[in-house]
């Protein structure tokens, strides 16, 4: 019996972490996610909108006008082609273009954030399947050991070496091991279902990782990387810059603007390319705004309020990211320390089990002592599997936070 447990310990001791196919799993999750596809097209829609609104101020307005009489009859004797172009507007056009560019970049950062969130969930789903698989193996082995104990107790009871109470205790332990195995099977099924829904395929070909996890930088380097690479912080920066450009765009509405208007009338002969530039009526208009229903004043005031809000939002984001990075980095260290502590506890439980088995054979300890010691070893093994899973998740959570993994 002890050899079986030692063999199990050797098998599980070879598992260093769950990360061999994480990159492939992340790619499949992103590729198969309907949510990501939806957000991709949402981003593309925003891209079209911001690009068109940013460029619109630089482009002319061209129209062809027809006249109708009171009976809605088309007057074919006269048509008018008009071109209007804003030449100078106090920098409003450039500010609007820059604002649209910053808003588009912020939208892109949010889309990348969605991919990071999905990637981390994919890591969790991958690790969960592996964790639940190993837990089930432990529960199945515990059930076999409990059955072996029960059989041994029955034989010893028939020989008068143990009491009926010890046999009943072994039966209770066996029944408990069955319920734990059934519970582990149910949790593994749920983990497989969650994996399928997220990744888009069954978790049949997963294997434990033998390669090392991506390296984790020191805390100061993580903080520096987060300040330059964190997607939430980048989005806040672009939002702040866009708000500043909006103030310039609204303020420019108070400044004079110079507009060009060119028009040409066409008779019944219609439009001819070779005569298109003849008799063109060109007008330059200098527009000096004085009062436009108060819209300009309120527009500037609102833009300034939005700029202040974006600035304070940026400061709050900086503080939050710093706290989150420190917390994530500490979680990595804590998970690593827990693994080491549980490994030591596992070794101690293995040695304790060996000693208790010898004492039971010498009738120095009871069967209940042996079963309790075995439970301690199984618990240490289960805790170790969970600790390694938590370590993998904490590492990827930190790496996504400092944006050191390209998606």
Please annotate each region the language model reported.
Residues 176-201, 346-404:
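Short segments within alpha-helical structural elements
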Residues 101, 164-175, 301-304, 367-378:
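Short, charged, amphipathic alpha-helical segments
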Residues 20, 115-228, 328-331, 335-339, ...:
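Periplasmic alpha-helical coiled-coil/stalk elements that build and connect Gram-negative outer-membrane
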Residues 76-78, 124, 169, 279-281:
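Transmembrane beta-barrel architecture of outer-membrane proteins
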Residues 12, 18-61, 87, 163, ...:
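Bacterial Sec-pathway N-terminal export signals of envelope proteins
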Residues 37, 60-76, 86-113, 234, ...:
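Small/polar (Gly/Ser/Thr/Ala-rich) solvent-exposed segments
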Residues 81-85, 195, 284-288:
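Residues on the lipid-exposed face of transmembrane beta-strands in outer-membrane beta-barrel proteins
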Residues 4-13:
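Sec-dependent N-terminal signal peptides
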């Amino acid at each position: 019996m002890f050899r079986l447990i030692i063999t199990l310990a050797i098998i599980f001791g070879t598992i260093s972490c769950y990360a061999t196919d994480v990159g492939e799993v992340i790619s499949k999750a992103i590729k198969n996610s309907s949510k990501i596809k939806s957000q991709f097209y949402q981003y593309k829609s925003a891209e079209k909108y911001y690009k068109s609104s940013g460029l619109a101020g630089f482009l002319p307005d061209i129209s062809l006008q027809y006249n109708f009489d009171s009976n809605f009859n088309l007057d074919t004797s006269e048509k008018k082609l008009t071109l209007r172009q804003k030449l100078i507007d106090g920098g409003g056009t450039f500010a609007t273009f820059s604002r649209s560019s910053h808003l588009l970049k912020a939208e892109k950062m949010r889309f990348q954030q969605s991919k990071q969130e999905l990637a981390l969930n994919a890591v969790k789903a991958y690790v969960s399947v592996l964790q639940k698989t190993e837990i089930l193996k432990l529960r199945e082995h515990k059930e076999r050991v409990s059955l072996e104990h029960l059989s041994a107790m029955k034989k010893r009871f028939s020989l008068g070496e143990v009491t009926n109470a010890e046999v009943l205790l072994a039966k209770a332990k066996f029944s408990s091991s069955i319920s734990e195995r059934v519970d582990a099977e149910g949790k593994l099924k749920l983990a497989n279902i969650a994996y399928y829904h997220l990744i888009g395929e069954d978790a049949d070909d997963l294997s434990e990782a033998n390669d090392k996890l991506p390296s984790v930088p020191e805390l100061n380097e993580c903080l520096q990387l987060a300040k330059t690479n964190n997607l939430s912080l980048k989005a806040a920066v672009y939002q702040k810059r866009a708000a500043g450009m909006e103030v310039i765009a609204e303020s420019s509405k108070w400044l004079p603007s110079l507009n060009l208007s060119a028009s040409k009338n066409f008779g019944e002969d219609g439009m001819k390319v070779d005569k298109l530039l003849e008799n063109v009526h060109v007008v330059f208009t200098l527009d000096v705004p004085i009062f436009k229903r108060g819209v300009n004043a309120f527009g500037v005031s609102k833009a300034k309020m939005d700029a202040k809000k974006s600035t304070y939002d940026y400061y709050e984001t900086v503080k939050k990211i710093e706290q989150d990075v420190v917390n994530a980095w500490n979680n990595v260290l804590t998970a690593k320390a827990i693994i080491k502590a549980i490994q030591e506890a596992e070794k101690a439980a293995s040695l304790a089990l060996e000693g208790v088995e010898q004492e039971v054979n010498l009738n120095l300890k009871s069967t209940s002592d042996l079963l309790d010691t075995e439970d301690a070893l199984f618990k240490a093994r289960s805790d170790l599997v969970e600790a390694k899973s938590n370590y993998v998740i904490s590492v990827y959570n930190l790496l996504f936070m400092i944006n050191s993994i390209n998606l």
